[in-house]
From Swiss-Prot:
Belongs to the UbiA prenyltransferase family. Protoheme IX farnesyltransferase subfamily. Pathway: Porphyrin-containing compound metabolism; heme O biosynthesis; heme O from protoheme: step 1/1. Carbon 2 of the heme B porphyrin ring is defined according to the Fischer nomenclature. It is a multi-pass membrane protein. GO terms for cellular component: plasma membrane. It is found in: Cell membrane. This is Protoheme IX farnesyltransferase. NCBIfam families: cyoE_ctaB. It catalyses: heme b + (2E,6E)-farnesyl diphosphate + H2O = Fe(II)-heme o + diphosphate. It comes from the Bacteria. One of its GO terms (biological process) is heme O biosynthetic process.
Amino acid sequence: MNQIEKTGELSASRFTVRDFTELVKIGIVNSNTITAFTGMWLAFQLNGISFIQNVDVIFFTIVGSALIVAASGAFNNVIDRDIDGIMERTKNRPTMTGKISGKRALMVALVLGVVGTIMLFMTTWQAGVLGVIGVFLYVVVYSLYAKRKLVSNTVIGSFSGAVPPLIGWFAVEPTFSIVPIMLFLVMFCWQPPHFYAIAIKRKEEYAAAGIPMLPVVKGIERTKKSMFFWVILLTILPFFMFDLGIVYVILATLLNIGWLALSIYGFKMEDSIKWAKWMFVYSLNYMTILFVAMVVISIFL
């Protein structure tokens, strides 16, 4: 065993809680768990199902969703080890520094994925199947193929990112209705402008890593047009969500108008990087306010 291997093995044996949270991408785990909770909460509220009497469903849904998202993040870190070292924002991930070896990261991902999937199947089989589909789309379709091969990688990756609210809904009420469909579409349409904002800020890094992000391949102006398109789609969705009441529709519409105005301003603003930062921050606040509002407003319906 050479010195590098010894150092890597020593580091991997000492990885911390922080290393673990970075491996599973805890920020993404948290945000996706919130959307899963929202889907679950709305299923309880809108279908007159007791929240208190289904503590087991709540537990298995929330923890199961968090675990499969964490597994997906860990799988992604294992897959991207060959390019993470090139990018500034990913070069210090524990799989790159040697704090967590590729083998150990893979084992963590497998365990999290299996346990999370079992927990989701303990609610309804539909929730379990959706969990499996979400992991497959993110790990296999997106991480292994689309991310490195297709300019449409962000849109393709948005399918998996829109699955958690469906899991939450179907864990409680395993039938289709307009609400879970709209939750899926909100998440699906929100992701391209959110991640394109990151791609604009990190354009040079993505180019160096050979990742065909839209700003790299088609340019920033083309990316701005695409972001504008997805925000327009978002402005339509509240009008199909009157089940959540007029207050929600008005709030969502105001948020959409604000984002639409910021998107339009991007065509006039010369500093595209600064504008992308504004779009990124707005997207985070948008999603937080929107999903918290869904939960709070539904209490009074």
